[in-house]
């Protein structure tokens, strides 16, 4: 298959970073004026991830129709997705209002609430203890009906009720719970098993509204999920499955939402998932059983997230231009946070072993510039705090820089002695 050959060539050359950069440079750029309005600032999780004006989802609210969500409409594949950010505490009601208004049957969540000690998403559905949630701002009630917990994903059956009309609908919530904090799943088997579970539920069928897909920013993992699904669908529809070009499909999707696929590793994983998924498209139905077996979905799920230790007390830096920067602020959401922080960390922590070191050189300059530009996140705040080594100089350095208090006194004594001796000599010469 052409795609498999292309994958092997790129892998062998260690060229994923360069190809990813090419896609970034070719991607569409459209205005995001509505997202940048002051009144919408607190509805954005990241300051640099905004929906394009032409493809944004509009709520049916009279006062403000904005939500950070985009409609991705793939004409040839006849598939539509709504890609959105993880809801904020103040946008959970808007999220479910969008699900209701767009007549969506399924929600795909690809992140955990807490990752690496940071809050990535609000708890926008009821847990077992509470059973239901009421969103007063949008007049909706959400009830947890059932929960099927597997080793790496959970499927929840929810009931969404419009309290104004008393109408209720079933919503399926597919939660992928073990996607690595930074990077990609170890193999495409578990991912494809999850994707086909979503497909088999009917949540992606055209008789329902677009499926809602989100991670934290709604571009990286969400883009990976939608790209793999669309490419497999196109391979199934076309007479020549090998004619599907993953890069072209991704560029088409980026016309509707910025930044889809955030790292070279995610691009590489998308290729792997499509190549493996193509075996099923080509008629090998046994692979689906293999995916299920390899994914070990019937094992015990990993333990719940253990909260991180408390952060140090808040400290402030010296005033700068009339403002103080707060260190270690533990906000639930900060609109000034930049998604670029995640991107930089992802590049540094989750590079695939197959990517050669020299291939990363094309990214190094860009990464350094962006590191200097990122100013709002915890990473930059921590960078401004001296390290332990900086605060604890060596003994020799301490001796060298220790103030010697007796030196000025000694100098004064010497000068006084010299003056007194000179005066005495003058007296003796002149008067004796």
Curated annotation (Swiss-Prot):
Its main location: endoplasmic reticulum. Its EC number is 3.1.3.48. Residues 297-322, 350-402 are annotated as: Disordered. It catalyses: O-phospho-L-tyrosyl-[protein] + H2O = L-tyrosyl-[protein] + phosphate. It is a peripheral membrane protein. The modification Cysteine persulfide is found at residue 215. GO terms for molecular function: enzyme binding; ephrin receptor binding; insulin receptor binding; non-membrane spanning protein tyrosine phosphatase activity; phosphatase activity; protein kinase binding; protein phosphatase 2A binding; protein tyrosine phosphatase activity. GO terms for biological process: actin cytoskeleton organization; cellular response to angiotensin; cellular response to fibroblast growth factor stimulus; cellular response to hypoxia; cellular response to insulin stimulus; cellular response to nerve growth factor stimulus; cellular response to nitric oxide; cellular response to platelet-derived growth factor stimulus. It is found in: Endoplasmic reticulum membrane. It comes from the Eukaryota. Transmembrane segments: none annotated. The modification Phosphoserine is found at residues 50, 242-243, 335, 362, 364. It is an enzyme of class 3 (hydrolase). Interacts with EPHA3 (phosphorylated); dephosphorylates EPHA3 and may regulate its trafficking and function. Interacts with MET. Interacts with NCK1. This is Tyrosine-protein phosphatase non-receptor type 1. The gene is Ptpn1.
